[in-house]
Amino acid sequence: MDKILLGCHVSMNKQNNYLVGSVNEAISYKANTFMIFTGPPQSTLRTNTNHLYINQMHELMNSYKIDAKDLVVHAPYIINIANSVDQNKWKFTVDFLIQEIKRCEEIKIPTLVLHPGSYTTGNYKDSLNQIIKALNIVSNYQVNVKIALETMSGKGTEVCSRLEDFKYILDNVKNKDKVGVCLDTCHLHDAGYDLSKWTEFKEQMKQNFSLDKVLCIHLNDSKNMISSHKDRHANIGYGYVGFDTLVNVVFDKDFSNISKILETPYIDKTPPYKIEIEDLLNKTFTNRL
């Protein structure tokens, strides 16, 4: 079997030389892939990519056999391309998304995960159409970067907690090769999908889109019971999704070539990723957190 691509969200900051620090953090967890934000997730503040140590990042990754094609960027949370109510806000977030795409192209990271957004006070179907409209616009700026729309928990007015929403979007975007899906195991569970029946869930996916549309997986346990629509991540093996179910996801041969990214909570301000990665690869829950 191919090597398991397993990593986590890592920080990127000035004191650790930006992207060089991101690679070093991933290496410290024995991760062979990772995900970053290119700036604060709740802000439009961005450091010019010329200052992010891009070349040094790629040199360091090469020495540790980490492939840039496996890396993931998460788009800022403030982007809401589903907004069908306020066109000025919608245009602002589309423009900001274009800037993020350009940054991914410059950093040479090919997958940009994006929360599809919320319909707020608008109409659900109108919001899905706004997403399609936005994706059609930004596709003109995508050269090597693909957007992975993330499965959501259905909290509040979030769209895309149903696989059918992804089918509708993927069927109707113009440049179908530039858009895919990011599966989030916590969100799927909270949205009502029973991932302990993984084979059945994959069949449900196949009824809506082909499995090769899955560009990455966010691997998280959940603090809440199924169908809770809460979106509260738990550490691996400590939640309602369960360790064995998450091991099944990690070792699924259909997804062997895509990155599984942990976004689990810190324990007493300490990242849990090294232990979680080790446990998952060993298929053994050691209860060390």
Curated annotation (Swiss-Prot):
EC number per UniProt: 3.1.21.2
Binding residues annotated for Zn(2+) 1, in chain numbering: 74, 115, 150
The species this protein was found in: Mycoplasma mycoides subsp. mycoides SC (strain CCUG 32753 / NCTC 10114 / PG1)
Name listed for the protein in its UniProt record: Probable endonuclease 4
Record family assignment: Belongs to the AP endonuclease 2 family.
Binding-site list for Zn(2+) 3: 187, 231, 233
Family matches, as SMART domains: AP2Ec
Top-level taxon in the UniProt lineage: Bacteria
InterPro entries: AP_endonuc_2, AP_endonuc_F2_Zn_BS, Xyl_isomerase-like_sf, Xyl_isomerase-like_TIM-brl
Substrates-to-products reaction catalysed: Endonucleolytic cleavage to 5'-phosphooligonucleotide end-products
Stored PANTHER family: APURINIC-APYRIMIDINIC ENDONUCLEASE, ENDONUCLEASE IV ENDODEOXYRIBONUCLEASE IV
Enzyme class: hydrolase
Any one GO molecular-function label of the UniProt entry: DNA binding
GO BP annotations, alphabetical order: base-excision repair
Entry note: cofactor: Binds 3 Zn(2+) ions.
